[in-house]
């Protein structure tokens, strides 16, 4: 299978997983994937390789860093965290740093 087709499938599967249950966003993501591949159909091999790397990186970012949130009745949100979701402590953003 060609690298471009593998990248397309990788992005398609990532968007299906991440945007499951949200048909409007899933349709927009699919449209963006199709448009991106259509616009880069006739590019040089070097540019194609770069775009394939970018596409695979986007799929990985979607899987690891995008979560869906659903508003609950008590002004809180329920997050849909998947097995692939990256969970960090964000210590670098929560520690207060004061100049001396």
From Swiss-Prot:
Record GO cellular component, one term: mitochondrial matrix
Keyword Mitochondrion appears in the UniProt entry: yes
Keywords, alphabetical: Chaperone, Mitochondrion, Transit peptide
Subunit composition and interactions: Interacts with RIP1.
Function: Assembly factor required for Rieske Fe-S protein RIP1 incorporation into the cytochrome b-c1 (CIII) complex. Functions as a chaperone, binding to this subunit within the mitochondrial matrix and stabilizing it prior to its translocation and insertion into the late CIII dimeric intermediate within the mitochondrial inner membrane. Modulates the mitochondrial matrix zinc pool.
Sequence similarity: Belongs to the complex I LYR family. MZM1 subfamily.
Protein name: Mitochondrial zinc maintenance protein 1, mitochondrial
Gene designation: new18
């Amino acid at each position: 299978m060609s690298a471009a087709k593998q990248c397309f499938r990788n992005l398609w599967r990532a968007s299906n997983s991440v945007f499951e249950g949200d048909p409007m966003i899933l349709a927009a993501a699919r449209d963006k994937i199709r448009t991106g591949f259509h616009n880069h159909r006739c590019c040089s091999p070097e540019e194609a390789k770069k775009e394939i790397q970018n596409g695979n990186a986007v799929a990985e970012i979607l899987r690891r860093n995008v979560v869906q949130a659903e508003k609950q009745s008590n002004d809180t949100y329920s997050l849909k965290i998947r097995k692939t979701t990256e969970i960090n402590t964000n210590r670098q953003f929560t520690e207060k740093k004061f100049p001396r």
